[in-house]
Amino acid sequence: MSNYKNFINYFKRSDETATLGLGMLVSGLILFWLGWSIYWIFFYIGVPLIPIGFALYIYGTTGRADENELKKIIQENTDAITFEDVKNSAEFRKRIPNSPTEESFGEYVFNTNVLMKKTKSGSVISSEYVCAKMLILNDAFLVRTYAFSFVANKTQKSEIEIPFASVEKIEMEHVNKRYMLNNKELATKASALVITHDGVKTRLPRKDDIYADEFVLKLNRLIKINE
């Protein structure tokens, strides 16, 4: 990914700029027509609105990415995390179930070092993202993560194997935080699957949907079966 500037513009420019520009452009054209055909004063009101509105619209829509591009990159990076090397490895052959299960995770990263934006849908996103996948073995969880930035050449890969025997607890964690953006307070909610093992906690970002609790129960049952 090399178009960092477009993503910087996406996070820094307001979505309302293009909307305002389009509104001014349309209003200017209508007033221009009214001034030409009905009353001259509308002409002089509409004429300056046209170039200003056009400039704002161009500024708000060009040279910047959009939400669909973010989603595309997220999907590409998530798909790039695979376990084909593990599945084809003689070392892991006996530890992989006949029908291995893979689970995907991912969420935007929120801290004071990222750019944040409130989307048109009302959700809050940031300029950094972490995606992960978990391969459930017969005796352990194998987790691979990939964290990256939309606005800079910043990436980080990691891998951890968590033996079932070392797991103390699996649960969902919810954290509410507030940040300031353009003098406005933004509320964010981060959810994660937390696996406590060997006295440490491994957090995998996961949306708190209707399947979250069911997934936690599934993993806990798996741990008990293999005790």
Name the predicted role of every residue range.
Residues 2-17, 51-134:
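Anionic N-terminal interaction surfaces
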Residues 14-18, 223-226:
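Short, flexible helical or helix-coil boundary motifs
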Residues 24-26:
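Alpha-helical transmembrane segments
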Residues 77-78, 87-96, 138, 171-174, ...:
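Hydrophobic, Leu/Ile/Phe/Ala-enriched alpha-helical segments that form helix-helix packing faces
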Residues 114-117, 143-150, 173-179:
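Short regulatory "switch" loops immediately downstream of catalytic or recognition motifs
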Residues 124-156:
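Conserved beta-hairpin
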Residues 154-227:
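Acidic, Ser/Thr- and proline-rich intrinsically disordered linker/docking segments
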